[in-house]
Amino acid sequence: MSNVVRSKFAIPFVLASLAMSSQLALASECAAPQREQGEHLFARDCAACHTAQKDGPTLMGPNLHGVIGRTPGTLQGVTYSQAMKSQKAAWTAQGVAAFIEQPQAAVPGTYMPYAGMADAGERQAVTCFLAGIK
């Protein structure tokens, strides 16, 4: 196999591996109280537009169950902005945290109207919740 062909397959594999290891590392770093806080914050700030249940419905925004590791803009039945559809790297815990800090700054042109979550601890808790749901 030529180096060009191998590299075409290596990059997506490496990106997927990094996303998966990021999720595993985050899940092991999150204590139960932090995940519980994240669930509360999700209910307070996110649940009006998003669900996070396996096979849950799409509301105004996409179902966030399994978001870490998923490619942005790919969940069926959701109308995404071109800006979101153009994102190619899978969501990581760090990417989710950056997005919920300031969605418009992270992905200019996103349809998400949320102003953002300023507190880093709260962002970490929400990310822990999303990473830990089964």
Positions of PLM-derived features:
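The N-terminal extracellular segments of secreted preproproteins, especially immediately downstream
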Residues: 1, 29, 45-48, 127
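Bacterial N-terminal signal peptides that target proteins for export
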Residues: 2-13
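C-terminal segment of classical bacterial N-terminal signal peptides
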Residues: 10, 18-27
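Electrostatic cytochrome c docking/interface patches
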Residues: 25-43, 52, 57
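Sec-exported extracytoplasmic/periplasmic mature domains
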Residues: 43, 47-54, 69, 101-105, ...
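Short cysteine/histidine-rich zinc-coordinating motifs and their immediately flanking basic loops
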Residues: 58-63
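Short Fe-S-cluster ligation motifs
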Residues: 74-97
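C-terminal capping alpha-helices of c-type cytochrome domains
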Residues: 90-134
